[in-house]
């Protein structure tokens, strides 16, 4: 097959041969086969080249038409003298290639008549030249009719092999063996032995191995052929097998065994050994057969046949014992493969005996390969259960010992093989497990392997290992499968058609279960219909159509692709009227193309359905369409069934701008639940009738279950009520919860559509909100099972446009399970309350999402003049106040409580009172969401409130917000409202007279709203007057949120901007306490400027004399700027001795300050008179600013401060509470419970969850780690050291301090109830956990404690250093345990800044006797680095002073550490100003970033009182931000702390680990503490220590630095002892010293210091009972608590370095301060007696949990476990589990390692669950045996 160019290259030749084969097959199928290729000039004609050439010129027809055959002839081998060469070439092409071209190139149908009836006029070459044997076949029917035999011998290819092997002809045998070798290779056509099992026997016979039965081939092959072929296989086996036991398997029938042994000796003497190799004919033949058997042993179907063939087993045993290396390797490999299917005969059979002999010999060998193969064979033998008895009996103890010895070798493959066989052996039962356990140190080695890392084997350990990962179908991404919705385009709504998903999927992934690919023909027809349409004037190239189809199929990785013939059939089906024409293409040398006429390409392809749903049963679509008066055709979003089971995909049904009298919203979200699928498609046409004035509402009650819903389908019902004067409450119970009915009457006029979308998946909201439709996104918070969520959307008057929502782009966010996250993109939302014509319609959309995941695309709130905007986050209800309507609107909100009693639903009543008439177009609205006190509630509900005021202006008397008490209906209600336990209808008239409405409501919890940013300078708000109406206890809440302009600050990145990121993790346990709010200011790193966060001021007034107070802007040119998050202005008056009486506010003015910039010289101006001016500095990178102060008390503080007091008579007690709980004074008991909220906090079981859920990094927010998720009754334990106490509960004191909410009974404030008739508690606001213990007012002395404000002093201290978040300053209180804001007082230490009068209820006598209420270390401590806090007590802002209150005498200075970046703003303290005045004293706190608080016990002498000035030294944070990421992988289950104490000198030897699970009683955990570490301390590093903080250990409070115009009167500091100079034995490189009392030893690393201190000073026998570290508070601690404290406070790198720096100056300062002890106020100079500190019950767990973030559990937690490490650990754990399950001896040995295994069982290792099962086996088996013994004794 040569052409004119000479010899073809190999590729061309290969292609030519393939073409000829295909051509022959084509002609054969048509009945016109050819055998010879035509020859031209003595050479074969290159048909492939001819076909290629002709087709490139356009095909046969085109070449003939242009008469180009003469040109083609020149390229082939026609003689030059041949005149008819062109004609001959054309005939050859016509005979061989024309039909092939027609079918394969042009894709036309083969219209040839089948060859059964050939036409005589065909050319001679078309007549079939082969004989038709089919004419002789007799049908089965005829055979049966005539009695012919029906039993046919169907010959197959295997019969040919068998016959070839049987023939004995060398030629045939070689051919058959070669074929078997090829077939045995892993390929598409694997040899199937079951088709003819005789092949195995014949192959073995050709290798000289025969069966012992009579029918064997030994006679033929062994004797007769040996003479003819000169091949003696018997001699071959005898030569290569030396083991006498195995030699008996050699079949030698000629000689008796008695005489052979002697002859063998002489043969070995006189004959040289066999030279094995290529020249050894027998050896090569045996090797060939061994290769075939080995290859076959990898196929499951062949393994059973090979294992059942005893001759094959004999051959393998002979091969395994031969000294022919290649043969031995092949034999052992094959034995290992078939051993799993090998059923051993009884041991008296020789093969069984030899099998164990082979295994033992391999195990005892010194050859690594033999050892591994022996273990593999033994392990696979264990897989057959019938072999268990034999294996347990005949595998001796020496073999077990040899196997276990392999574990000590640093060889990965050997260790893996050993673990595999040990695991298989332990599955056999108690005999094997006991034998393993009896091997010395076997259990110890296995326990060590559980925590082994692959790095222990060295860097070259993986060189010999090749990892082949098989991706499982469960891990395949489903994101690429996007079923497309086929929208129904409606002309009325003008919805443009847009495919919802991509037409081409980039990556092929298997569809999820239940999704089946549609068949090829249907897909091709859909594809044609989607891409082409009928057009009689157009044509499309048919080849291009097919090529595009092939391209689409390849991109989609479709399985079935139609051939061109099938494709053209589909083309005729889709376009039956098309025609075909030939079109000349001038660009390709005049080549003609076949075009399809009458078909045109679509401009926009239609969507294609690629999959269909097999299980459409579980889906339900609820569509409620209510069309009042005028009913246009609804436009449902058609969604194929396939979309309802695909998670994380959404259907985008665009909603265009409707006409003026039609508003429609379409949303469709495919939802994937846990077990069910809910699909909600809602479309609600708006009532276009302008003349109808209807009173209606559309309440929707959705009762959800937080647990997975196995059966029910989650449904969302959309109700559009068009019937006048009817309320339509709808209850949908999902998950079995009892539906709670909600009856609400709405008096606004106009229809109100409500769209409720309920889903359990991530909702992506695209830009689907029409411009005239405000979007109210209401996401229910943590909803326990059966808790109703009621959302009532108030209708708006028809004549007023409610607002617009513009430009809401899609925003995608990934949220972990159980967390809500609402992110917004920074597009403006403008909600205008302007008036429109009566014909305008409004529409609100309420989206109710379940507590799984929600991503709501809303936008930043940008306010201009007369703009009202609000957005509501999780669990919040929204009511718009100020919308004018003829009647007072009344809306009841049934909010969410965590599993309350069925009859006690938390209710939140928001009363709307429009004050101005609709004719006032400039009226502004205030959105207030509050929550009332709950009556008879078991614990504080998880209710969060949003208080959003109009940022631009607040007209006088605009907003009235009241929180009512259940079962109270106000007298001024315009219409009767049913009052139930669940709903509190409350109405307010526009008058300012107070109304009697029950007990005081709770202090409002504010949900920080995303900072509002403006691109332009907005005009300053006009003077605004807010009138607040007061209820019976005169408790009124008014929250104003001014809008600040952010001039010059660009929009931040939209990916980081968020409205509200809130996380309410589901807590475990039946009595889940109230959740906390996350109030993060979104962390957006601005490029070069600081952004202005959203200010918020909370004014809380308790007054029965004045009905309101004024908030007036001073000048229009200024704007009220109040801090980042939450600022509560609490001017607190001294409560009189009588009942509930407070002083009115005369004129409380908010001074609008100028816009705060980053410049350090920002000036804040104060006003004169009795005014309190708050100016909050929200900037991120503030230098210490210069503050010019006016006459007034001026507080310049970042967001989150509590300022108490202006003057007597102007003060506003936050909440005046009557004494409760049967107080002797007889006050009425108040059962209101305040939800124990801290504003800016997260409660979660794991910090990683919080980080992942909120999308924030570690430095972006506080995360409060919930330690004991299942607390009793409402006592919420947090790791922050705050006890949240509820009504009727005197909360136990956590770490010496209480969290007293403002509605707490005074019995919790540290005073005796008898002496406290009334306690004025000051709450610092929800975003801070400052001095929540508040001011404990004493009735007799009329004194109020100093309110010590410590915004960041209560944060968990990590490594003993308080350091701030490295962030943008948008958040104040960050509470992540290993945070830079962490200064933790929960480990048994009490915060020295604590007012000691509120420390403990047991302090009543002391507090009553000497009334010594002290503020430790001064009243002001600022930790934040970006603000200057200045408090000047003016004459009218007096600091209350009584005999026991001590204030700072001078400025409290914080020296700024230069090496720490500036951090977030902190808070400043304002003393109460009631009685006496300290003139001219200024307290300036210059916060430093990451600075160590002066009271931290981690440093030796932090606070030195020198001339009345307290200095705060700064310490660098031990772990920088870069280090924080490395701590994230610590094995941390929920609520578990794992502590590691490892010896740094020999790191790999042992580690001391302890873990305390969440929910465990600390006293119980302490009993399980392991003492082995102390016992083994002398020999090697301690193994495992369990650190538990004691539950109730009395601890003395911290010393207080008192500066009150007198010398400092503080008790001797524990760090006042002189610190000796460093150890003279210090060696080079030793930079860290143990600062333990009189130790002074030097070490190289902090870990060495920690190990030394934990073992030498914290040992069981030497621990003195308290920490004697220099500068540490002398608190009594249990030893396990001390170890945690030691690691947290003292043994970090920075803490040690700081201790060294402050060692010498610390001595002088502490001694100096300790010598100053004059009297204070005439009291004696003796130090105050230490008070006992009552630890919270969960203090131990929280202390353990808190430090877990700092541990570097590097052995197996830093990096993710590799596959080999995971395999080794998991296999070792499985072995231990089996040993613990079956072996009594093993259990006894495992008991010693129970503590170690307990730690590992709660880690994040892959083997942790297996280890937990192992521990269960240890305990359960013992208990079950004890029970069996007891039952036997009873019988």
Swiss-Prot record:
Q: Where in the cell is it found?
A: Nucleus
Which sequence ranges does the entry mark as zinc finger (C2H2-type)?
1632-1657
What coarse category fits the chief subcellular location reported for this protein?
nucleus
CDD domains referenced in this protein's UniProt entry, alphabetically: ARID_ARID2
- Low complexity composition-biased segments: 823-843, 985-996, 1025-1044, 1602-1623
Keywords of the record, alphabetical order, are: Acetylation, Chromatin regulator, Disease variant, DNA-binding, Intellectual disability, Isopeptide bond, Metal-binding, Nucleus, Phosphoprotein, Transcription, Transcription regulation, Ubl conjugation, Zinc, Zinc-finger
S-S pairs: none
Q: Which residues carry this modification: Phosphoserine?
A: 4, 631, 635, 689, 1300, 1391, 1496
Residues of the ARID domain: 13-105
What are the start and end residues of every segment in region (Disordered)?
819-844, 962-1057, 1266-1287, 1295-1314, 1321-1341, 1488-1522, 1572-1629, 1703-1728
The Gene Ontology biological process annotation of the record reads: cardiac muscle cell proliferation; chromatin remodeling; coronary artery morphogenesis; embryonic organ development; heart morphogenesis; homeostatic process; negative regulation of cell migration; negative regulation of cell population proliferation
Q: In which tissues is it expressed?
A: Highly expressed in heart.
Modified residues annotated as Phosphothreonine in this record: 653, 692
Top-level taxon of origin: Eukaryota
Q: Name one GO cellular component term.
A: nuclear matrix
Name positions with the PTM N-acetylalanine: 2
Q: Which disease is it linked to?
A: Coffin-Siris syndrome 6: A form of Coffin-Siris syndrome, a congenital multiple malformation syndrome with broad phenotypic and genetic variability. Cardinal features are intellectual disability, coarse facial features, hypertrichosis, and hypoplastic or absent fifth digit nails or phalanges. Additional features include malformations of the cardiac, gastrointestinal, genitourinary, and/or central nervous systems. Sucking/feeding difficulties, poor growth, ophthalmologic abnormalities, hearing impairment, and spinal anomalies are common findings.
Q: What is this protein called?
A: AT-rich interactive domain-containing protein 2
Native organism: Homo sapiens (Human)
């Amino acid at each position: 097959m040569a052409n004119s160019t000479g010899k073809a290259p190999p590729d061309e030749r290969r292609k030519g041969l393939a073409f000829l084969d295909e051509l022959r097959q084509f002609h054969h199928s048509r009945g016109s086969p050819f055998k010879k290729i035509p020859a031209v000039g003595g050479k074969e004609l290159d048909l492939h080249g001819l076909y290629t050439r002709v087709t490139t010129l356009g095909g046969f027809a085109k070449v003939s038409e242009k008469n180009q055959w003469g040109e083609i002839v020149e390229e082939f081998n026609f003689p030059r003298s041949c005149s008819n060469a062109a004609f001959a070439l054309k005939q050859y092409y016509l005979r061989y290639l024309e039909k092939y071209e027609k079918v394969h190139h042009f894709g036309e149908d083969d219209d040839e008549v089948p060859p059964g009836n050939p036409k005589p006029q065909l050319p001679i070459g078309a007549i079939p030249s082969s004989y038709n044997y089919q004419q002789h076949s007799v049908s089965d029917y005829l055979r049966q009719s005539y009695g012919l035999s029906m039993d046919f011998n169907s010959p197959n290819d295997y019969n040919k092999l068998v016959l070839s092997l049987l023939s004995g002809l060398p030629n045939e045998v070689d051919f058959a063996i070669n074929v078997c070798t090829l077939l045995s290779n892993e390929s598409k056509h694997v040899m199937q032995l079951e088709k003819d099992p005789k092949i195995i026997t014949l192959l073995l016979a050709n290798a000289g191995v025969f069966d012992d039965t009579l029918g064997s081939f030994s006679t033929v092959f062994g004797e007769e052929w040996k003479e003819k072929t000169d091949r003696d296989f018997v001699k071959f086996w005898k030569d290569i097998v030396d083991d006498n036991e195995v030699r008996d398997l050699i079949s030698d029938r000629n000689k008796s065994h008695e005489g052979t042994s002697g002859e063998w000796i002489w043969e070995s003497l006189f004959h040289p050994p066999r030279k094995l190799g290529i020249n050894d004919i027998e050896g090569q033949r045996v090797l060939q057969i061994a290769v075939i058997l080995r290859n076959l042993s990898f196929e499951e179907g062949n393994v059973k046949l090979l294992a059942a063939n005893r001759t094959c087993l004999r051959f393998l045993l002979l091969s395994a014992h031969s000294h022919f290396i290649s043969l031995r390797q092949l034999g052992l490999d094959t034995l290992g493969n078939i051993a799993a299917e090998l059923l051993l005969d009884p041991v008296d059979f020789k093969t069984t005996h030899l099998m164990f002999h082979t295994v033992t010999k391999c195990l005892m060998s010194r050859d690594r390969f033999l050892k591994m193969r022996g273990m593999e064979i033994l392990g696979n033998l264990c897989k057959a259960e019938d072999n268990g008895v034999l294996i347990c009996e005949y595998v001796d103890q020496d073999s077990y010992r040899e196997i276990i010895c392999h574990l000590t070798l640093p060889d990965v493959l050997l260790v893996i093989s050993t673990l595999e066989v040990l695991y298989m052996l332990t599955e056999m039962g108690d005999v094997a497990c006991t034998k393993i356990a009896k091997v010395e140190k076997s259990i110890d080695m296995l326990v060590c392997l559980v925590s082994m890392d692959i790095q222990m084997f060295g860097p070259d350990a993986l060189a010999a290992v090749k990892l082949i990962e098989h991706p499982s179908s469960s891990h395949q991404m489903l994101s690429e499968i996007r079923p497309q919705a086929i929208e129904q385009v409606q002309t009325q709504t003008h919805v443009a058609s847009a495919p919802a998903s991509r037409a081409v999927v980039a990556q092929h992934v298997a569809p999820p279960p239940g999704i089946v690919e549609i068949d090829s023909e249907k897909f091709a027809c859909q594809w044609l219909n989607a891409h082409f349409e009928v057009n009689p004037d157009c044509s499309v190239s048919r080849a291009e159509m097919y090529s595009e189809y092939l391209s689409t199929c390849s991109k989609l990785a479709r399985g079935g692709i139609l051939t061109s013939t099938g494709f053209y059939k589909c083309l005729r089906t889709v376009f039956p009227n098309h025609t075909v024409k030939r079109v000349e293409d001038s660009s390709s040398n005049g080549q003609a193309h076949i075009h399809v006429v009458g078909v045109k390409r679509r401009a926009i392809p239609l969507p294609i359905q690629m999959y269909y749903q097999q299980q459409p049963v579980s889906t339900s679509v609820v569509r409620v369409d209510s069309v009042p008066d005028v009913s246009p055709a609804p436009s449902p979003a058609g969604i194929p069934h396939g979309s309802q089971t695909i998670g994380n995909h959404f259907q985008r049904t665009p909603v265009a701008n409707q006409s003026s009298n039609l508003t429609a919203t379409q949303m469709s979200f495919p939802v994937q639940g846990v077990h069910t699928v809910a699909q909600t498609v809602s479309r609600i046409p708006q009532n276009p009738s302008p003349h109808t004035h209807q009173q209606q509402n559309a309440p929707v009650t959705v009762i959800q279950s937080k647990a997975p819903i196995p059966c029910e389908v989650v449904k969302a019902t959309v109700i559009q009520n068009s019937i006048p004067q009817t309320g339509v409450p709808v209850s949908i119970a999902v998950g079995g919860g009892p539906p709670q009915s909600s009856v609400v009457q709405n008096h606004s006029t106009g229809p109100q559509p409500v769209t409720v979308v309920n889903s359990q998946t991530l909702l992506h909201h695209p830009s689907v909100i029409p411009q005239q439709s405000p979007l109210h996104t209401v996401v229910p918070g943590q909803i326990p099972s059966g808790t109703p969520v009621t959302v009532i959307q108030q209708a708006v008057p028809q004549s007023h446009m409610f607002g617009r929502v513009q430009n809401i782009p899609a925003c995608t966010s990934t949220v972990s399970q159980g967390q809500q996250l609402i992110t917004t993109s920074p597009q403006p939302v403008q909600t205008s309350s302007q008036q429109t014509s009566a014909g305008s319609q409004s529409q609100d959309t309420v989206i109710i999402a379940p507590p799984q995941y929600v991503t709501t695309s809303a936008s930043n709130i940008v306010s201009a003049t007369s703009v009202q905007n609000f957005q509501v986050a999780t669990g919040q209800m929204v009511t718009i106040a100020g919308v004018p309507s003829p009647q007072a609107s009344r809306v009841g909100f049934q909010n969410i409580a965590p599993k309350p009693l069925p009859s006690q639903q938390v209710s939140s009543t928001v009363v709307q009172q429009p004050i101005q008439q609709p004719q006032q177009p400039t009226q502004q609205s205030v959105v207030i969401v509050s929550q009332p006190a709950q009556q008879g509630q078991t614990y504080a509900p998880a209710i969060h409130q949003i208080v959003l005021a109009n940022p631009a202006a607040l007209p006088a008397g605009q907003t009235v917000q009241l929180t009512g008490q259940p079962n109270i209906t106000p007298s001024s209600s315009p219409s009767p409202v049913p009052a139930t336990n669940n709903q509190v209808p409350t109405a307010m008239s526009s008058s300012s007279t107070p109304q009697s409405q029950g007990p005081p409501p709770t202090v409002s919890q504010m949900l920080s709203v995303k900072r509002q940013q403006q691109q332009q300078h907005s005009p300053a708000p006009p003077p605004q007057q807010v009138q607040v109406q007061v209820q019976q206890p005169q408790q009124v809440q008014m929250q104003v949120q001014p809008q600040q302009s952010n001039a010059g600050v660009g929009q931040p990145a939209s990916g980081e901007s968020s409205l509200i990121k809130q996380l309410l993790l589901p807590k475990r346990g039946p009595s889940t306490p109230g959740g906390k709010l996350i109030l993060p200011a979104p962390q957006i790193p601005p490029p070069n400027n600081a952004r202005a966060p959203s200010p918020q001021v909370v004014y809380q007034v308790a007054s029965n004399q004045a009905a309101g107070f004024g908030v007036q802007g001073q000048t229009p040119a200024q704007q009220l700027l109040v801090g980042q998050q939450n600022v509560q202005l609490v001017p607190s008056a001294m409560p009189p001795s009588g009942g509930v009486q407070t002083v009115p506010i005369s004129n409380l003015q908010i001074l609008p300050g100028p816009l705060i910039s980053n410049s350090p010289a920002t000036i804040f101006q104060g006003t004169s008179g009795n005014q309190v001016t708050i100016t909050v500095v929200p900037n991120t990178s503030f230098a210490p600013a210069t503050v010019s102060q006016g006459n007034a008390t001026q507080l310049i503080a970042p967001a989150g401060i509590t300022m108490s007091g202006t003057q007597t008579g102007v003060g506003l007690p936050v909440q005046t509470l009557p004494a409760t709980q049967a107080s002797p004074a007889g006050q009425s008991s108040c059962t209101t419970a305040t939800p124990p909220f801290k504003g800016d906090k997260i409660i979660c079981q794991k910090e990683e969850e919080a980080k992942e859920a909120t999308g924030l990094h570690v430095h972006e927010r506080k995360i409060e780690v919930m330690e004991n998720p299942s607390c009793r009754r409402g006592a919420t334990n947090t790791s922050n050291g705050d006890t949240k106490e509820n009504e009727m509960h005197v909360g136990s004191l956590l770490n010496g301090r209480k969290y007293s909410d403002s509605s707490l009974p005074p019995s919790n404030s540290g005073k005796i109830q008898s002496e406290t008739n009334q306690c004025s508690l000051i709450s610092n606001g929800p975003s801070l956990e400052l001095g929540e213990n508040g001011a404990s007012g004493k009735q007799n002395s009329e004194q109020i404690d100093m309110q010590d404000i410590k915004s960041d002093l209560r944060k968990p201290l990590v490594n003993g250093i308080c350091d701030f978040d490295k962030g943008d300053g948008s958040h104040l209180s960050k509470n992540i345990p290993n945070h830079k804001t962490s200064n933790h007082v929960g480990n048994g230490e009490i915060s020295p800044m604590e007012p000691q009068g509120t420390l403990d209820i047991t302090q009543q006598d002391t507090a009553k006797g000497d009334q010594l209420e002290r503020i430790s270390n001064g009243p002001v401590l600022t930790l934040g680095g970006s603000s200057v806090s200045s408090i000047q007590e003016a004459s009218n802002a007096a600091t209350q002073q009584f005999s026991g209150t001590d204030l700072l005498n001078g400025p409290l200075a914080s020296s700024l550490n230069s090496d720490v970046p500036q951090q977030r703003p902190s808070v400043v303290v304002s003393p109460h100003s009631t009685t006496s005045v300290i003139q001219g004293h200024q307290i300036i706190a210059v916060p430093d970033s990451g600075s160590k608080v002066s009271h931290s016990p981690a440093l030796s002498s932090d606070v030195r009182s020198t001339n009345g000035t307290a200095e705060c030294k700064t310490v660098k944070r031990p772990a920088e931000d870069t280090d924080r990421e490395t701590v994230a992988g610590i094995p941390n289950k929920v609520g578990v702390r794992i502590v590691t104490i490892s010896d740094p000198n020999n790191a790999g030897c042992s580690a001391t680990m302890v873990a305390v699970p969440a929910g465990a009683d600390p006293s119980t955990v302490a009993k399980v503490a392991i003492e082995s570490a102390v016992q083994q301390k002398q020999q090697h590093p301690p193994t495992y220590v369990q650190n538990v903080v004691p539950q109730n250990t009395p601890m003395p409070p911290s010393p207080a630095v008192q500066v009150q115009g007198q010398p400092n009167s503080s008790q001797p500091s524990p760090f006042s002892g002189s610190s000796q100079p460093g150890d003279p034995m210090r060696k080079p490189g030793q930079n860290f010293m143990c600062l333990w009392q009189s130790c002074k030893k030097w070490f190289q690393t902090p870990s060495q210091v920690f190990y030394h201190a934990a073992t030498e000073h914290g040992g069981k026998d030497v621990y003195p009972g308290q920490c004697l570290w220099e500068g540490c508070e002398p608190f009594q601690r249990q030893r396990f608590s001390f170890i945690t404290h030691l690691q947290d406070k003292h043994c970090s790198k920075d803490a040690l370095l700081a201790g060294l720096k402050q060692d010498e100056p610390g001595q002088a300062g502490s001694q100096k301060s300790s010598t100053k002890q004059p009297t204070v106020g005439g009291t004696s100079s003796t130090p105050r007696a230490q008070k006992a500190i009552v630890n919270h019950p969960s203090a131990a767990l929280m202390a353990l949990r808190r430090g877990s973030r700092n541990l570097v559990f590097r052995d197996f937690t830093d990096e993710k476990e590799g596959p080999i490490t995971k395999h080794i650990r998991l296999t070792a754990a499985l072995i231990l589990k089996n040993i613990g399950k079956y072996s009594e001896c093993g259990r006894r040995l495992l008991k010693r390692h129970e503590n170690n295994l307990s730690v590992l069982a709660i880690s994040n290792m892959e083997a942790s669950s297996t280890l937990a099962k192992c521990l269960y086996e240890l305990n359960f088996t013992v208990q079950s045996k004890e029970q069996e013994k007891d039952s036997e004794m009873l019988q």
